[in-house]
From Swiss-Prot:
Protein name, UniProt field: Mannuronan C5-epimerase
Secretion signal, residue range per the UniProt entry: 1-25
PbH1 repeat segments: 219-246, 281-303, 305-328, 330-352, 354-376, 377-399
Gene that produces this protein: algG
Superkingdom as given in the UniProt entry: Bacteria
One MF annotation (Gene Ontology) recorded for this entry: isomerase activity
Length: 519
C-alpha cells in the first residue's frame, strides 16, 4: 500500500533490510506500574502555520581549531615543578580525604603518598621530566615518558603535553593520574594508562580496579587536540576516565571557582570507563573526535552542565550502556552531526529533566536498544536525524512533553519508528526528590519518514496531545500494511485520511486529561 507519492528512501530501506537482516527485539520486563490509559480521543485537522519551522540555527564551529588552541597557550612565564605530599591539597581531597581513601596511594607508593605539582606558570612535559627524580618520572625510550606519581596542575599552573612527547604512560601500579586545577593543553600526542607488569596498556579488567584517569576541577580550562587517550578510569567518583567537574558542593562554596570549560578536538578515546564525563560544566566543546570501545558510556555530560556542543563525533562499541547521554538538567546544548552506532543500549539519550536541547543531523544505527531515547525531559527539538536498524525503537519518548520531532527518518528499526509512552517510576529505586517526573507525554511529528519498522511507524500511549503533519510512512513490514499502534490505532482510518489523502495536519487530543484519570 503506497501512502505517499514520493519513495525517496524505500529502495534504501529494502537494501538495508536485505543486507543486515531485520532488527529484532524482545519486550523488556515491566518494572513499574503503567498509568490508566485515556479512553477516548478526538481526531481533528489542525492549523499548519504553527507547525512550520525553519531548520534550526547551528552554532558556528569554525573557531574551534588546533590553531586557536595554540593561541591560548601563555608560555611567557616559566612555571615551577615540585614534589609534595598529597595530603592538605584541595585538589586531591577527593582521593585522600576520609574513608581511608589514602590507603590506595600508600599501598601503591609504599610510603606517604606524594605527587608532582606544576605551579605559577608554563611547564612542558619534557621540562618536567628533567626536574623530577627518575624513579618517579622517566623517559623510557625517545619521546616516551612513564609517570609513577600523580601529576597536579596548580591553580596558576599551565601544563603542556605536545608533539615532542610520543606517549605519556601513566603507571597503574604506581597509582599515577592527572589532575588539572589550572590550564592543561594536550596536543598531537598519546596518553595511556599503563600496566608496567605487561609492558602495555592498563586494559579494563574490573570496575573496582584502579586505572589512571584525568580530572579537571572548577575554574579550569582543558584542551585536548589530535591526541589518543586509552585505558583510563574505573568505578570511583571523579575517576571515570576524562572528567571535567566543578568541585563538590561544600568545597565549591568555599573556593568560589567558576564552572570549568574546554575543548576536545580531533582526538580518540578508547577502553575508558567513561569516554567523557562532566559535572556543572559550561560551554565545553567535543568536536570531530572518536569514542570507541569504551566500557560504560562514550560521552556522558551530567548534572547541570549547559551550553555544550557535541558535534561531528563518531561513537561506537560502548560495552555496557549508551553511546551519547546527557543526564540531569543538562540544558541548552547541541548534539549535532554525530554518528552513534553498535552501542550496547541507545545511540543518544536525553535524560532526567534535560531541556531545551537540539539533537540534529545525527546518524544513529545498529544500537542494541533505541536510536534516540528521551526520558523525563521536555521541550527538546529532534531534527533531521537518521535512525536505522536499531534493535528496538527509532525514537522513544517517555514522560516528556513538548517534544518536537521534525524531518527524522526512522527506518528498519526492530519495533516502532516513533514510540511515546508514560510510566509511573515511583515503584523503582529512583530518588524522586533528586529526579522528579510527570507522567505526561506530548509529541509533534512533522515531516520525515517512518519506514519498514518491525511493529509499525507510530505508537503513542496516553498522550496529552499528538500532532502529525507530512509524515511519510512507507514499506510496511506487516502483511496488513500500515498499522498505527496505541491510541492512534483506534482512529487509524481518520488519521490516515487527514494526514495522507487530504495532506492536512492532524491533532489527536484526549477527551479526558491525565489529571482527571489520576484522580
Amino acid at each position: 500500500m503506497n501512502l505517499h507519492p514520493h519513495l525517496r528512501h524505500s529502495l534504501l530501506a529494502s537494501a538495508l533490510l536485505l543486507a543486515s537482516g531485520l532488527a529484532t527485539a524482545a519486550e523488556p520486563q515491566v518494572i513499574a506500574k503503567e498509568l490508566q490509559q485515556a479512553k477516548t480521543y478526538t481526531v481533528a485537522s489542525a492549523p499548519i502555520e504553527p507547525l512550520q519551522m525553519d531548520p534550526p540555527k547551528l552554532p558556528d564551529l569554525t573557531g574551534f581549531t588546533a590553531e586557536a588552541v595554540q593561541k591560548k597557550i601563555d608560555r611567557r612565564h616559566k612555571g615551577k615543578v615540585s614534589l609534595r605530599r598529597m595530603f592538605q591539597e584541595d585538589t586531591l581531597k577527593e582521593f585522600v580525604g576520609g574513608d581511608n581513601k589514602a590507603a590506595e596511594w600508600v599501598q601503591r607508593q609504599h610510603g606517604i603518598p606524594q605527587a608532582i605539582f606544576v605551579d605559577d606558570g608554563h611547564v612542558d612535559l619534557t621540562e618536567l621530566s628533567k626536574k623530577v627524580p627518575k624513579q618517579y618520572f622517566s623517559e623510557v625510550e625517545p619521546g616516551v615518558y612513564l609517570a609513577r606519581l600523580p601529576i597536579v596542575v596548580g591553580q596558576k599552573g599551565i601544563l603542556e603535553i605536545d608533539g615532542k612527547v610520543k606517549q605519556l604512560r601513566l603507571s597503574q601500579e604506581g597509582g599515577a593520574f592527572l589532575v588539572n586545577d589550572g590550564k592543561l593543553f594536550v596536543t598531537d600526542t598519546q596518553v595511556t594508562g599503563w600496566r608496567e607488569k605487561d609492558n602495555g596498556p592498563a586494559t579494563f579488567r574490573s570496575p573496582k580496579e584502579f586505572r589512571p584517569f584525568l580530572l579537571s576541577w572548577g575554574g579550569t580550562e582543558t584542551y585536548i587536540v589530535n591526541t589518543k587517550m586509552a585505558s583510563f578510569g574505573y568505578a570511583k567518583s571523579k575517576s571515570y576516565g576524562v572528567s571535567i567537574s566543578q568541585y563538590t558542593p561544600n568545597m565549591a562554596k568555599r573556593m568560589g571557582r567558576p564552572e570549568p570549560t574546554g575543548w576536545i578536538i580531533g582526538s580518540e578515546f578508547s577502553d575508558m570507563w567513561y569516554g567523557f564525563y562532566c559535572y556543572e560544566t559550561q560551554d565545553f566543546v567535543i568536536k570531530d573526535s572518536t569514542y570507541r570501545d569504551n566500557i560504560v558510556y562514550g560521552i556522558d555530560p551530567h548534572d547541570r552542565s549547559h551550553r555544550l556542543i557535541i558535534a561531528g563525533n563518531t561513537v561506537y562499541g560502548t560495552k555496557k550502556k549508551h553511546g551519547i547521554i546527557v543526564s540531569r538538567e543538562v540544558n541548552d546544548s547541541w548534539i549535532i552531526n554525530n554518528k552513534s552506532y553498535d552501542n550496547k543500549l541507545s545511540g543518544v539519550v536525553i535524560d532526567r529533566n534535560s531541556v531545551n536541547n537540539l539533537v540534529a543531523y545525527n546518524e544513529i544505527y545498529r544500537n542494541h536498544t533505541d536510536g534516540i531515547t528521551l526520558y523525563e525531559s521536555g521541550d527538546n527539538l529532534i531534527w533531521g536525524n537518521k535512525l536505522v536498524n536499531n534493535r528496538r525503537h527509532g525514537i522513544r519518548v517517555r514522560n516528556s512533553v513538548n517534544i518536537r520531532l521534525y524531518e527524522n527518518v526512522a527506518m528498519a528499526n526492530g519495533l516502532v519508528g516513533v514510540y511515546g509512552h508514560i510510566k509511573d517510576l515511583s515503584d523503582t529505586d529512583r530518588d524522586i526528590a533528586l529526579d522528579p517526573f510527570d507522567t505526561k507525554v506530548s509529541l509533534i511529528v512533522v515531516g520525515g519518514e517512518l519506514s519498514a519498522n518491525g511493529s509499525g511507524p507510530l505508537s503513542i500511549d496516553s498522550p496529552l496531545s499528538v500532532e502529525l503533519y507530512k509524515v511519510s510512512m512507507l514499506a510496511p513490514r506487516k502483511a496488513s500494511g500500515i498499522s498505527l499502534n496505541g491510541v492512534l490505532g483506534e482512529r487509524q482510518d481518520e488519521i490516515l485520511d487527514l494526514l495522507v489523502r487530504q495532506q492536512k495536519a492532524v491533532l489527536i487530543d484526549p477527551v479526558e486529561r491525565q489529571t482527571e484519570m489520576i484522580d
